[in-house]
Amino acid sequence: MKISWNGFSKKSYQERLEQLQAQALLSPEKQTSLEQDEQISVTVADQLSENVVGTFSLPYSLVPEVLVNGQEYTVPYVTEEPSVVAAASYASKIIKRAGGFTAQVHERQMIGQVALYQVANPEQAQEKIVSKKAELLELANQAYPSIVKRGGGARDLHVEQIKGETDFLVVYLHVDTQEAMGANMLNTMLEALKPVLEELSQGQSLMGILSNYATDSLVTASCRIAFRYLSRQKDQGREIAEKMALASQFAQADPYRAATHNKGIFNGIDAILIATGNDWRAIEAGAHAFASQDGRYQGLSRWTLDLEREELVGEMTLPMPVATKGGSIGLNPRVVLSHELLGNPSAKELAQIIVSMGLSQNFAALKALVSTGIQQGHMKLQVKSLALLAGASESEVAPLVERLIAEKTFNLETAQRYLENLRS
């Protein structure tokens, strides 16, 4: 059944729930969970963290009509920032018309490290460790046999000498973690390897730990957008495309711009990571390290022009070692619901959706910046927050926002005064 999302953003909260039910996007059980606003319980929260005194909520939204590799998705977003969902929805709709996103997973492995120091003969130690690679991989797999049964496990091992104030001999373990992110898995394997590596190197082990710089879990998303989709006026569409390509170059050249450029990308990525129960801090750390791989901090996405085909071409590659199993994913009702909304994707499929949405978010931001300016769409949503802060009820928000925008006055004192006038 073809789903129509026309006017979804204009509907009331209740009408949106009714549309989800009518289109059977969720199982009856999950539909009920959503309608009853079922959240993680304090009892469960108390087992997940420490010193718990309650739970904390954020807006839960949907970005419809996201086309990735020919498959259409309804993507859950968790974010409190105004205009992020609107921008993602706008961009995804344009990109869908242009053919959607193409995404691919280059590899799906995690990397862990054992750092050795006080190694008297690093070259000899390196040779010894490499010569025992097969035995070390077997030992790692014995430490976590369940992943081997699921088709994963330790796949490779290499050694590097790191020169510095203190010299380190670092052993890198590459592990196929299947559907899990694999932090506990990697750390368990590395702990098992430490005493053997100390013996082989005749050195001391400083630590064994997963790395969040997941260069073995790279995902690329790309899209091609004809100039005509950027504006109703052909010449203006080309001009916008040219400016977006220049904005991309600016983010490659200037770290001050790159930081904001990448923050905008993560407006979308973090929203999905949170919704799907993934560790957004780990993903951000790895991506920002990846943005600095050439020795200076750069924008993660690139937009170029294909003048022959009259298209704007976007592409982004970054580490995306997300999980669909493990951690707290199965314990939070809203996270379980998110996975169902997406069609219960595999970890690889989810990674492709997430990177595509990061590129979508970036498209929307750059297009706004080089044309209407970022504030035009952003301000109306910011003013809604101001109206709520002033104490407006649901029925009072729209007229108060309209008045504030008309008067171009955006402060709490004025909003409260206008609200009093509205009520009198």
Predicted segments — roles?
Residues 276-280, 288-388, 392:
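C-terminal catalytic subdomain
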Residues 1-46, 51, 73, 89, ...:
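Alpha/propeptide regions of enzymes that mature by internal proteolysis
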Residues 179-181, 186-331:
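Glycine-rich anion/phosphate-binding loop at the beta-strand->alpha-helix junction
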Residues 33-34, 100-106, 143-156, 200-212, ...:
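Flexible, glycine/charged-enriched surface loops at secondary-structure junctions
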Residues 1-73, 77, 81, 101, ...:
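Acidic/polar, glycine-rich intrinsically disordered N-terminal extensions of enzymes
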Residues 45-50, 54-166, 170-174:
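Small-residue-rich
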Residues 55-59, 66-68, 106-109, 150-151, ...:
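Solvent-exposed alpha-helices and their adjacent loops that cap or buttress functional pockets
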Residues 60-84, 178-186, 252-278, 358-367, ...:
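Conserved phosphate/anionic-ligand binding catalytic regions in large, soluble enzymes, centered on
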